Amino acid sequence: MYVIIHRVIQMTVIIDADACPVVKIATAESKKAGVPVICVCDTSHILNDGYARIMIVDKGSNSADLTVVNTCQKGDIVITQDYGVASMALAKGAKCINQNGMYYTEDNIDSLMAMRHIASAERRKSSKHHLKGPKKRTAEDDEKFLKAFISLLNI
């Protein structure tokens, strides 16, 4: 006689929450869907939320990033702006999305990592380090993220 054990794995949304502009949107939508949320941030980005579990890590160059990667599992959704975090989360079987609604996939992560490396090398070569920063976030940006995120939640 064989016994088949079905293990139910619940998806969790894990947010690399240091300076993430879509924490509230993702948390609200996850709550509607009944999906747990974990927000990971360092001590300089304290969050308060009645639904999400907040993981506060020490300040450090990769503390939050490594916690996100170590926490995620196959089937989870990871929200991050960091290509390195996305690459490691994808390797663990997580689905990854950035704050603009772009999906990180096995098909695009290598080229994104290569572009990041090239841009970093160019910045090191240049004596001018004038970084403009991201453009101001709009309601359309939030809507684009929301649409893509809902699509991931419903997979």
Model segments located where?
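Nuclease catalytic cores that cleave nucleic-acid phosphodiester bonds
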Residues: V8, T12-I155
